[in-house]
């Protein structure tokens, strides 16, 4: 699969990596982001397993390569580390705020691309260079894709690259859905927040999320 939306290696994309591991970077996230990421990781793993069981994406090369039982534990890691790029932002910019100025919002929205670069750099032990080198390792690609593409949306309205439809990696689609499920369930005040969250997510089939993937929630 082409690295659609991949961070291009250039002088502008070099970053200073002060972390020695993903876990060290994870610990640099503010508590609420760490807690959210743990929940999203659990939902991602469950959705990943359900997607495999339902043959979601059957016949599509990218799905065949990535949607395999051997990657179930990896799916959890993809959910856990999907916001790792926020470790490269100041704490006050790690949590989205409605009051952000345009400049602050633009800074906040750099975290997915920074996350991919952080993941890739530590994979390659190239912390000093802070650049991404190509890889054909599916597990490595899935982690990079989850970081960079989880805020992309099916209709192309997401960020950072405005990808749409099948341009978005399967694992990123799943992490994005898991994150939205967590957000809705956390905001809904009722006895059955997950049931109501799923009802809301079904309305986004073909808009924010893949219709086929939404069916996994049924």
Language-model-derived ranges and their functions:
Residues 3-218:
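Histidine- and acidic-residue-rich, metal-dependent catalytic cores
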